[in-house]
Amino acid sequence: MREQRKATLILDDGSRFEGYSFGCERAVAGEVVFNTAMTGYVESLTDPSYRGQIMVMTYPLVGNYGVPMKAAEPNGVSCFMESDRIHMEGIVVSDYSHSYSHWNAVESLGDWLKREQVFGLTGIDTRALAKHLREHGSMKGKIILEGGEDIGFADPYTVNQVAEASCREVIVYGTGSKKVVLVDCGVKDNIIRSLLREDITLYRVPWDYDFHRIAYDGLFISNGPGDPNMCSVTVEHIRRAVAGDKPICG
């Protein structure tokens, strides 16, 4: 195993947390948030809701069950992930496990992060960091390698993350009796899997698509990343739907 490079997470209030890299070695910046789940790092990393963020995992051991194979159902929905790629800028853990064991694992978390150009930082007291974020709110942050390039902080509210996370065209799933429109503001695949358990035809539409072109029976609005103030087109479409009589969930 090669020697790990030292790296530092710097928050925009000046706080510094030093550790070691285990993913792609490039400077990254994003909004720093935390996750208290004991498992599910694969699902979190591929969840479009976390696009552009640096995720802090408070559970101490991460990576011990590796990363599953990329597989999709016949309709194209991922089997083991929440999308077809990682959306985060980086992941911060207390203790990264280089070795892994799971019946469905095909590679380590570190190798996956390298392929996806995502930074992994280990050796951090993530619970102290999470406490700091809980007390002061989510912050802008950046991860810099020792002796490497320095970069500025990234403002998450200057980029339309929803537009980047959303699908680009209408996608149709199923052939059920009822038509449901899913407004994709950064939907994760588990929502699609859950909806398709019902007897419906699901129309997944881009965030700014005028879904009133479709004679739908129900409307589902997904969650997503970024600032909702950048989604004024979506808001206008939803306002028109609210004035109607079709059921809306979101």
Task: List PLM regions with ranges.
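Short amphipathic alpha-helix with an adjacent loop that forms part of the alpha/beta core around
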Residues: 209-215
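RNA-binding accessory domains that recognize and position tRNA/RNA substrates
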Residues: 1-209, 228, 236
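Cysteine-nucleophile active-site neighborhood
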Residues: 216, 223-250
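Short, hinge-like loop/turn segments at secondary-structure boundaries
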Residues: 138-140, 219-222
